[in-house]
Amino acid sequence: MKYRKKPIVVEVIRWTGDNGKEIEAFCGADVMFGTIYEPDPVSAACIHTLEGKMYARPGDYIIKGVNGELYPCKPDVFAKTYEAVEE
């Protein structure tokens, strides 16, 4: 079987590595900042998601789902899945 996503509107913020205050305002207590090593050090936002901790790297989007759940999304996947809406 195949399924299509229902057309929903989600809130999104992009993690730049420099916008920690905006990310904190968007995510609330569900985010922490630090460095991960892969193997070089990279600034990261650690997000508490429904599946556990996930990391957003600079350039990634953080999406707030329909029930307020948070999850990171890589830019290429975001571009294929979402489009801007007029407010």
Where is each model-derived feature located?
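N-terminal domain-onset segments
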Residues: M1-S43, T49-L50
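Short, compact, well-ordered microdomains
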Residues: E51-E87
